[in-house]
Amino acid sequence: MLMPKKVKHRKVQRGRMKGKATRGNFIAYGDYAIQATECGWLTSNQIEAARIAINRYIKRGGKLWIKVFPDKPVTEKPAETRMGSGKGSPEYWVAVVKPGRVLFELSGVPENVAREAMRLASHKLPMKTKFVTRKDFEQTGGEVNEG
C-alpha cells in the first residue's frame, strides 16, 4: 500500500475540502486520464484496487501513472472505547481529492481500451469521475463540468 516513509506530524486534523483543485488538474504524462468531479478522500487501498483493475484490463500494453499520493493519516479509536482519553492511533492513509484533480493517466493503448480500463477503475473509487483526453484539455483547458 502507498504511504509516506517519514512524516513531520503523526496525527493531523480532518480539515475541510473547499473549492476546486489548483494543482494536478491537467494531463502531464499520458494521453488519457480520469478526473474527479467531486471531492473526497481516496484511501491507499482504493488507489491500489483501481491500479490493479486498470493493469488487468490493459494487460501488458500501455503505461500507467498514479497522480495522487495518500499523505494524510486518518486515526480511529478501538471499538467499544469510552469517549475521551486522547486521539486514536493512525489506522490508514488518504489522499485529499478536490474536483478537477487528475487521478490516473494512461498512454500507449487505443482510446476504447483506455476508456474501458478507466471505467473499471472508477467503480473502485468513492467519488464521481470523468474520462478525459489530452485533446479535451487543449480545447477546454481542463475545466471541470459536473455531470
From Swiss-Prot:
For this protein, the record's InterPro entries field holds: Ribosomal_uL16, Ribosomal_uL16_bact-type, Ribosomal_uL16_CS, Ribosomal_uL16_dom, Ribosomal_uL16_sf
> GO biological process annotations for this chain's record?
translation
GO MF assignments: rRNA binding; structural constituent of ribosome; tRNA binding
> In the UniProt record, does the keyword Disulfide bond occur?
no
**Key words of the record:** Ribonucleoprotein, Ribosomal protein, RNA-binding, rRNA-binding, tRNA-binding
Query: Can you name a GO cellular component term?
Result: cytosolic large ribosomal subunit
Query: Which family is it part of?
Result: Belongs to the universal ribosomal protein uL16 family.
What quaternary arrangement does the UniProt entry report? Part of the 50S ribosomal subunit.
Question: What is the role of this chain?
Answer: Binds 23S rRNA and is also seen to make contacts with the A and possibly P site tRNAs.
The UniProt entry, under NCBIfam families, shows:
rplP_bact (TIGR01164)
* This protein's name: Large ribosomal subunit protein uL16
Organism of derivation: Clostridium novyi (strain NT)
Gene that this sequence comes from: rplP
